[in-house]
């Protein structure tokens, strides 16, 4: 009886349940848009409160926001370089904050308590469509960075230091977004599934330290994603000699 009950509970942990929105011939994952809008709205409110009354001696939310600004500035300067890092700070900062808030929102907010006609809510970054879209955005960004800074000379990168590297450099353009998207998706989805399984097995105590570990992992994944995005952009604008 216990085994049957346990298997029934595990069966409830389905992966890939979706609320679909049909717009013409396009079918969208509605739950991703809902959670993204909620989290982005919360982030905008947080930033608005922190910048409402700017003071020379920052404290509270303003102090936290200035710390994040300084951290993102240092990250962008280190990875992209002194020359153009300022142009890319808003992009890198937005990526970091969106991934961070999405990851933590999935770990802290009990989305499953909100009932939908079909599917269930969860972290936007636990959906492969979100992470692939973010990774493709990064790819377009470093192509744009290279072309806008070097023009057609950017394509010299593909044959540097020798033309033998051409097929490997082309392959790299495909593996970069794949690694970015699947790393983030896999880690966040795995964290949600592990916590879900433990809640079924021991719902009172054991899931709590695992949730704290998930929060730490989620923050690290946001940092890795933003750092790699900045690194790829820096690689695109770097002058080869």
From Swiss-Prot:
One of its GO terms (cellular component) is plasma membrane-derived thylakoid membrane. Its main location: membrane. It comes from the Bacteria. Keywords: ATP synthesis, CF(0), Hydrogen ion transport, Ion transport, Membrane, Thylakoid, Transmembrane, Transmembrane helix, Transport. The chain crosses the membrane at residues 30-50, 91-111, 128-148, 193-213, 214-234. InterPro entries: ATP_syn_F0_a_bact/chloroplast, ATP_synth_F0_asu, ATP_synth_F0_asu_AS, F0_ATP_A_sf. This is ATP synthase subunit a. The gene is atpB.
